[in-house]
A protein has these predicted regions:
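A short, conserved beta-to-alpha structural element at the edge of catalytic cores
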Residues: 18-41, 145-151
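Short, P/G- and charge-enriched loop/turn segments at secondary-structure junctions
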Residues: 37-43, 118-123
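Short, surface-exposed, charged loop/turn segments at secondary-structure junctions
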Residues: 12, 37-41, 67-72
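Extracellular/periplasmic catalytic domains that process cell-envelope and extracellular macromolecules
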Residues: 15-16, 45-47, 125-128
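GT-A fold catalytic core of metal-dependent nucleotide-sugar glycosyltransferases
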Residues: 1-31, 52-55, 62-63
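Glycine-rich, flexible loop/turn motifs
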Residues: 7, 44, 95
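A glycosyltransferase accessory/donor-loop signature
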Residues: 55-175
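A recurrent flexible, glycine/aromatic-enriched loop bordering the glycosyltransferase active site
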Residues: 41-52
Length: 175
């Protein structure tokens, strides 16, 4: 549920150093949900979105233990709202290098929040020039009937381009 609209070179070149992941937190204009998730998961760091992750595979092979994940889910299963994201944050959130969500994991539902937080700087032109990854977070998706958010037309534009330039794959693409 992501749409890449600008190059990913800078993300690819990101030095993870000792971090396990690089990810973005969707803090919103009040950071309320971020703080609720900190309390809920008993963490002292931002709540990172798992939709776009840059992974340090070498470190992950050493640090990530299946048993630890299964034990956490067994103990907290009824408390997990977004299980993959909750596990990432609870067990490994302190190992995350924070990315700018407006560039690397732009929540397509929240255009007005980004505009407000930036004092009007991060407008539609800015998004089209600076954002690399649009993320269609939540249940509403631009390929589903009734999608009402701002970036639905952009998604449809890319679907049309894909159909035009990859005609042999039309059956894999929906509007």
């Amino acid at each position: 549920d992501i749409l890449v609209i600008n190059p990913l070179y800078a993300l690819w070149e990101t030095d993870l150093s000792d971090h396990l992941f690089a990810a973005a937190a969707h803090t919103g204009k009040t950071e309320l949900s971020n703080n609720v998730n900190r309390i809920r998961l008993k963490t002292d760091h931002d709540y990172y979105n798992s939709g776009v992750l840059l992974m340090n595979l070498k470190k992950g092979r050493v640090m990530i233990r299946r048993e630890e994940i299964f034990a956490f889910v067994a103990e907290h299963g009824s408390e997990l709202f977004l299980p993959d994201q909750d596990v990432l944050n609870a067990l490994y959130g302190s190992e995350v290098l924070a990315l700018d969500d407006a560039i690397w994991n732009y929540d397509a539902r929240n255009y007005r929040n980004y505009l407000l937080r930036s004092g009007g700087v991060r407008d539609m032109k800015w998004v089209m020039q600076q954002t690399s990854i649009l993320h269609f977070c939540g249940r509403a998706k631009p390929w589903k009937h009734g999608y009402k958010y701002r970036f639905g037309l952009l998604y449809q534009h890319y679907v049309q381009l894909t159909k035009r330039f990859l005609p042999d794959h039309k059956e894999c693409i929906s509007l």
